[in-house]
A protein has these predicted regions:
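Carbohydrate-associated surface elements
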Residues: 177, 198
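Nucleotide-activated donor-binding/catalytic signature segment of Leloir-type glycosyltransferases, i.e.
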Residues: 265-281
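Aromatic "clamp/platform" in nucleotide-sugar-dependent glycosyltransferases that forms part
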Residues: 282, 301
């Protein structure tokens, strides 16, 4: 007799067996890869997959939401007590010093049909070197391993990272340009694939309609993302100082937080840009800020497949971005803005161009209307499901 069992949002239809899937990611505390994982597990077919997401810690930005969709476990639990903090520190220390096999067996635990390392670095190192042979392993790569090889250090060098990736059955890059970089550096072309990020285009549009008063003079350039060195906020400040000195009127809204925040504040102050550049910090809903700006700027030195740029295109906000992995694919041949050379000078000229020719904004918005249709969440989640099913 057929029956339906509901468990933490997972629905099992009698007569069929679910594919058990482990997804390991260090954190759910904001960030592009974390948001993409949240989007993915929110809509993936629960009648096909029994998914468990494992992280190092709990009580992070997306923890409760992810837990409402799928199973979630973490190495540590937070309850605020002194003893709890001591225990958590011991567990994290163990996770860093123990072998990958020990971490997999003693902290992640469980048996799965498919094991996914959802981000390069530590997650990839643990899943790739776990020694497990009775499952399929997938490594998800969200960065350009040539232009931003940050994860090499986690493995102790590029050669160790290459050997780790050889232990995977499949490697997923989130853009064609990232795939090209990966294959150029590490080879393994036969098992490197492209699966585009799952972006909630409908939620992006709905949230963008919420009211917000930026209280800034126009035109407004908006930036969104973690305040880290690779995002290039430092050079954006220097460029704004030059534009100001050239006599241009504009303002900048920066959304996000991160380790570079104090340095950026210092740069803003040193360049007397406090009235021009406003840091709004982390925002639960960045979409309403972006929608109410005139231009979205990505000043990054390197990207994988930018969720923020994709969302700007969905919202019809013209984009200026440095040349990074995935940008051409996001534009998809449409005139969505300017992709400039990845240099301070080129970014300056791109911003200057739109200040000189504001009529271009309407032209780019028309291109974005055509392109926005390609970000369908339904089609992208089907691609993810098909990939996991057929691995």
């Amino acid at each position: 007799m057929n029956s339906t069992v509901v468990n933490q949002g997972l629905r099992t239809k009698g007569g069929g067996s679910l594919k058990k899937v482990l997804v390991f990611i260090e954190s759910l505390d904001g960030g592009g890869a974390e948001a993409i994982l949240r989007n993915t597990v929110s809509v993936i077919d629960k009648s096909k997959f029994d998914i468990t997401v494992v992280t190092e810690t709990d009580n992070e930005r997306y923890t409760d939401e992810v837990r409402s969709y799928v199973h979630h476990r973490s190495f540590t639990k937070r309850n605020g007590s002194v003893l709890n903090e001591i225990v958590n520190k011991v567990i994290i220390k163990y996770s860093l010093l123990a072998s990958e096999k020990a971490v997999r067996n003693n902290l992640i635990k469980g048996d799965y049909d498919v094991e996914i390392a959802f981000c390069e670095g530590y997650a990839t190192k643990v899943i790739g070197n776990s020694g497990r042979k009775n499952c399929k392993k997938i490594a998800w790569v969200h960065t350009d391993v040539i232009n931003h090889p940050w994860s090499e250090a986690i493995h102790g060098g590029a050669e160790n990272e290459r050997k780790c990736y050889e232990n995977f059955d499949a490697i997923v890059c989130v853009s064609e340009t990232m795939k090209a970089s990966f294959v150029k550096k590490y080879g393994m072309a036969e098992k490197v694939h492209v699966v585009y990020n799952v972006i909630d285009d409908e939620e992006t549009r709905i949230k963008s309609e919420e009211s917000v008063n930026l209280d800034l003079p126009r035109p407004i350039f908006a930036l969104a993302g973690r305040l880290t060195q690779v995002k290039g906020y430092d050079r954006l400040v220097r460029i704004c100082a030059k534009l100001r000195d050239m006599g241009y009127d504009f303002s900048v809204a920066v959304l996000g937080k991160g380790e570079e925040e104090e340095n950026i504040k210092k740069l803003i102050s040193e360049n007397s840009l406090d009235e021009r550049i406003k840091l709004f910090g982390f925002q639960e809903n960045p979409h309403k800020f972006i929608k109410n700006s005139d231009v979205f700027v990505c000043s990054s030195y390197a990207e994988g497949y930018s969720t923020a740029v994709s969302e700007a295109v969905i919202l019809g906000v013209p984009v200026i971005t440095t040349e990074c992995s995935g940008m051409g694919e996001i534009f998809g041949g449409e005139d969505c803005g300017i992709i400039c050379e990845n240099s301070d000078e080129a970014l300056l000229e791109a911003m200057k161009k739109l200040l000189d020719e504001p009529s271009l904004l309407e032209f780019y918005k028309e291109g974005e209307k055509k392109r926005a249709e390609s970000f369908s969440m339904a089609s992208r989640i089907r691609a993810v499901e098909d990939f996991i099913e057929n691995i």
